[in-house]
Swiss-Prot record, chains A, B:
One Pfam family cited in the UniProt record for this chain: tRNA-synt_2b
GO biological-process terms attached to the record: prolyl-tRNA aminoacylation
HAMAP family reported in the protein's UniProt record: Pro_tRNA_synth_type2
Complexes and interactors: Homodimer.
Species: Sinorhizobium medicae (strain WSM419) (Ensifer medicae)
Protein name according to UniProt: Proline--tRNA ligase
Domain of life assignment: Bacteria
Keyword Membrane belongs to the record: no
Cellular localization per UniProt: Cytoplasm
Role description: Catalyzes the attachment of proline to tRNA(Pro) in a two-step reaction: proline is first activated by ATP to form Pro-AMP and then transferred to the acceptor end of tRNA(Pro).
E.C. number(s) listed in UniProt: 6.1.1.15
Taxonomic placement: Bacteria, Pseudomonadati, Pseudomonadota, Alphaproteobacteria, Hyphomicrobiales
One Gene Ontology CC term in the entry: cytosol
Gene3D superfamilies: Anticodon-binding domain, Bira Bifunctional Protein, Domain 2
GO molecular function: ATP binding; proline-tRNA ligase activity
Length: 442, 442
């Protein structure tokens, strides 16, 4: 993408309304724009990051055996009356009447709808296990939306729903998703710690929140330091294998970790003092096993191998992509701006033309842009008329991992500078060497 | 994808509520499920097609120079009061009040919001031309939703919005999108004819509907037969070049074509009788140039090269992906089911194991599945326990372009059958020859 043809409205000033660094940087870099309280547009730069985060989530959901569909945003009130949550959900549910005066709602979550889909098609244990997910907008009418897309009203959620014949099957499903979440957050550059958590309005028997540590987190969390070093399940993980799933789950639940709602002072105090971690955290995922809560109320049953009807056991598993993006920024930035982890950055490489209009600079930039693009990189070429200082500041604040700087003096020797955004390390080399180095490091 | 692990609930019976073939086939094959009147879930098979259609739309939008963002579904009523459309829009607009009693609405389109975004960031002609698009859910509270996702209430729309300094610039933007639409529909296997059209509630001076001919179409259309043979702009089309855009536009508007609202009997009668086409059509795209209608009302101005303020000229450009999917089916099916054009099919190839559990069949299927997958194909392997006849019917109805049939008798000679879904042509060859043939034809 040539910056002269892109739409990336960088703000010169820090927006006053931003209380936390991710919100400030997302507004400054033109990633998002608030349309109404808690309702945001994802501008082109932000949309690129959001797409890449979604792609990672999707890959790991698919790897674990979950299947993607797409449920609508609007739901009929009837479904929620069946489960009993229509009245229970309170003011966070956005209730709507259509032109025929039928009561509807903007889905805050989809347990009811997916259970309705399940019961209408699946009649036999032979079709189990089943895990269906979608990445779809939700609306929760928060009384105090804040921190940009960290706590917004209209937000994107990946929500998966598992169906199993019995509790043992459902626990395997839960552990599959547990392992998939560990992989997902790791690929997003985050160390997320699964913590025992309250089940809230979803309900159920077993629940973990995945929390990343950050000073701006809304939750107070307590855990063992060992979590910082635990291994992440590899790409070759066999999610079908019960023993593997058990081993991962046991490892990652072998140490104390709890949010304040579930905190047990005595258990935490039993940890040697130097190994305790008491910090603030951001919830980036939440998984639930709730047995037959919805399947019972809504009649989701299958014939078992014994020829009898069984009410299915369910779980649900959420990740909020529109919250993950600011969470990643909270975890990865410096005074100059965002530092995107590889694979999530809006562009892989930014080529900075220090003197647009200079023949040698333009030619070298054109070659870098074209060759790196052909090699499969997402390249941003800063071909605008801005002065070099402004271009450097822009490249830093938007956090593209690698900068290739093309200036008139060095290009006279056929050389460019390659800068690593994270470490600040710079290296001077020929255009060809730069291309070869970047392609080799892919 | 192994069918035994996929979720594809094929219905045995034709659903009674379906009046047109696409609706019937989408329900039969488990592509969609109705949740409420005019509100659908896209089940996994349908979601795969929808994703591929969106990918084609996105590629062609990007190629033409448009930039993707993502606006929210809910909008504040205030914005629409500014443009004057809040009262004008009528009952199709879903009006909502949030917990603070603020009037909001589920966006039926985004002219107001994009104009608001534009005016808050763009102040100079130097940032023009600009075309911003998103692919986002819309809601229109149709009095009579019908034909499945062909006319639903919650639907997906790709809507692009162009901003230019003057009318000449806006006409170039209009013609860019005109050419992009020709390419898009062609890649989706459709012959879409641009027809002069009424501008409806969007308003404006110039408008074309892109119509495909189909007996089940809701519009009556009239055009010259020459449209069926016109060339589609190539991949190397230079969208920046005004002369190229003019040439394409002139060619494709050189013959009579109008919907019934804009029909002129006399002009149509002037066409020699054998060259007239009077038929029913499905609208698959609609483009508008409406000058300063919204920019004037909402104060979207830029400084021109003359140092003076200019109210920008705008256009908007819509395609409905959730309507395109059934439109493609209307245009491409036979008595046995859907016939997907290449590139849009939910899977590229289906490997049918006629006797799951038979060692030779299982081994050959495993190899085909693995090798074709590695070659980059989306492969569905029917490894279920169903009888062969049922598997053939399923492969036909879901419309995957190529079937590779592995049966115990032919595999004893090391052979499989390759069937073309569209022509019905079958060829027997070795497993290796089948793989080579399919990879070579990619």
């Amino acid at each position: 993408m040539r910056l002269s043809r892109f739409f990336m409205p960088i703000l010169k000033e820090n927006p006053k309304e931003a209380e936390i660094v991710s919100h400030r940087l997302m507004l400054r870099t033109g990633m998002i724009r608030q349309q109404s309280a808690g309702i945001y547009t994802w501008l082109p730069l932000g949309k690129r990051v959001l797409d890449k985060v979604n792609a990672v989530i999707r890959e790991e959901q698919n790897r674990s055996g979950a299947i993607e569909l797409l449920m609508p945003t609007l739901q009929s009130a009837e479904l929620w009356q069946e489960s009993g949550r229509y009245d229970a959900y309170g003011k966070e549910m956005l209730r709507i009447k259509d032109r025929q005066d039928r009561p509807m709602l903007y889905g805050p979550t989809n347990e009811e709808m997916i259970t309705d889909i399940f019961r209408s098609y699946v009649k036999s244990y032979r079709n189990l296990p089943l895990n269906l997910y979608h990445i779809q907008l939700k609306f929760r009418d928060e009384i105090r939306p804040r921190f940009g897309t960290m706590r917004s009203r209209e937000f994107l959620m990946k929500d998966a729903y598992s169906f199993d014949l019995d509790r043992a099957g459902a626990e395997h499903a839960y552990k599959r998703m547990f392992a998939a979440y560990l992989r997902t957050f790791d690929r997003l550059g985050l160390r997320a710690i699964p913590m025992r958590a309250d089940t809230g309005p979803i309900g159920g028997n077993l629940s973990h929140e995945f929390i990343i540590l950050a000073d701006t987190g809304e939750s107070e969390v307590f855990c063992h330091k060992d979590f910082l070093g635990f291994d992440i399940p590899g790409e070759d993980t066999n999610f079908d294998d019960v023993a593997s799933m058990n081993a991962i789950f046991e490892k990652w639940t072998s140490r104390y970790a709890a949010t304040s709602e579930m905190h047990e002072e005595a258990a935490f105090d039993a940890i040697p003092e130097g190994e305790r971690l008491s910090a603030r955290g951001i919830e980036v995922g939440h998984i639930f096993y709730f047995g037959t809560k919805y399947s019972e109320a809504m009649g989701a049953k299958v014939l078992g191998p014994d020829g009898k009807e069984h009410t299915v056991h369910m779980g649900s598993y959420g990740i909020g992509p529109t919250r993950l993006v600011p969470a990643i920024i909270e975890a990865s930035h410096d005074d100059n701006g965002i530092i995107w982890p590889k694979g999530i950055a809006p562009f892989d490489i930014v080529v900075i033309n220090m003197k647009t209009g200079d023949d040698a600079c333009d030619t070298a930039c054109g070659r870098l842009y074209s060759d790196l693009g052909k090699a499969g990189f997402d390249v941003l070429l800063d071909d605008t008329d801005e002065r070099a200082g402004g271009k450097f500041a822009t490249a830093d604040i938007i956090g593209v991992p690698v900068q290739v700087i093309v200036g008139p003096r060095s290009i006279a020797n056929g050389e460019v500078e390659v800068k690593d955004r994270k470490t600040g390390a710079r290296e001077t080399m020929t255009v060809e060497a730069a291309i070869n180095k970047l392609v080799a490091a892919r």
